[in-house]
Amino acid sequence: MLYDDMPALFPQHTPEKVRAAFVPDVIVGDLDSVRPEVLAFYGEMGTRCVDLSADQDTTDLHKAVTHMVDSAWRVQQGSGGSLDKEIAGKGWATEHRIFAAGALGGRFDHEMSNVSAAHEFVDTHVVLIGRHSMAFVVPANTSVAIVPDVEREGPSCGLVPMCGPAGSVRTSGLRWNLEGDSLEMGRLISTSNALDVGGTGGEVRIETDAPLLWTTDVSRLWNDEAP
């Protein structure tokens, strides 16, 4: 995604210039799906590769997020070691976000594993991005304000209860707002909704008693026509 698709965001520059401007500090995972020429390019640029193919119980995204949280934890606490999800959820720099490019689109089972990782690391604020959608988890028992970039996001959006029923959900800033409604897979879910933030100061507010996956259309981010 970084090597092949990042140049599409900057069509005014050559692909080589864009790739040289966005060099990862580390490549983490099984490394089985990375083309040799991509590894060679980033290796020459100083990127460190961490081969974790011995661990077949977690996905590449899970490994990458754990590595990032672990590194941040060492910097903040002066100690390191492997992190389980309890450590990852200890309020690591709540102003940070992890953007997982390429996490949506492609194989459905891969998408579901990435959604699962976003739920597991909900306190680490993992944002999943694909060519047409962006998604992140709204935690249970919270009231959150989201300020979408309406020039690049939407209008399509949705709220999906991926982890079980949500008994009461309230929203503002949507075309079809929820007023304490219950959301549940197999019954009512709020897909094919739309942003309508003109009367809410540019923000969407979501109040929920259960985790919800918030998603918006980002086709325009990639110079594609929104569906």
List each model region and its residues.
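Long, charged alpha-helical interface segments
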Residues: V138-P227
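Class I SAM-dependent methyltransferase SAM-binding "motif I" and its flanking Rossmann-like core
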Residues: D109-H110, N114, A118-D149
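Structural recognition of alpha->loop->beta junctions
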Residues: H13-I27, F121-H125, V147-E151, S156-G167
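Acidic/Gly/His-enriched mid-domain segments of enzyme catalytic cores or analogous surface patches
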Residues: M1-V122
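Short, surface-exposed, polar/charged, turn-prone segments marking secondary-structure boundaries
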Residues: A54-T58, G78-G80, H125-I129, G186-I189, ...
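Short beta-strand segments
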Residues: A101-A103, I129, V160, E207
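Short, solvent-exposed coil/turn elements at secondary-structure transition points
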Residues: S33, D55-Q56, H132-M134, P165
